[in-house]
Regions:
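A cross-kingdom feature that marks ATP-driven nucleic-acid transaction machinery
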Residues: 1-119
């Protein structure tokens, strides 16, 4: 059971490769100014999928049991300062809709069974 999130990431990674994407892991630089000093950090994005001039940032989460976990997963996507597509894939919760930040929420099965799910 502990390995299930890793298996899910593996499935997503392989599906992205199958669809012709170059896939990498990304670190998004973030800056915190709350202390009066600028502190630099980074947030990890699970996948950066690139094909031709298309870039998609993808976060993967097995479950989103509460608002805190949702914020943890969405924060890196919200911090990306460009207009490329951003997607959160969960095992069951995603319904194929965009949220108020323009992030697409997909469930794993819709992602796998619909090759156009990222279009």
């Amino acid at each position: 059971k502990d390995q299930e999130p890793h298996y899910m990431e593996n499935v997503i990674y392989n599906e992205l490769l199958y669809r012709g994407y170059h896939v990498s892991v990304g670190a998004i630089p973030v800056f915190d100014h709350s202390s009066g000093k600028t502190q630099r950090g980074s947030l990890e994005v699970d996948f950066i999928a690139e094909k031709f001039d298309e870039t998609i940032y993808i976060q993967s989460a097995l479950y989103i049991p509460d608002d805190e976990k949702m914020e943890q997963e969405l924060r890196p996507l919200r911090k990306i300062g460009n207009s490329f597509k951003k997607v959160l894939i969960t095992k069951y919760e995603g319904n194929g809709a965009y949220d108020e930040d323009g992030i697409l929420h997909l469930n794993l099965f819709d992602f796998l069974l619909n090759e156009k799910s990222l279009d």
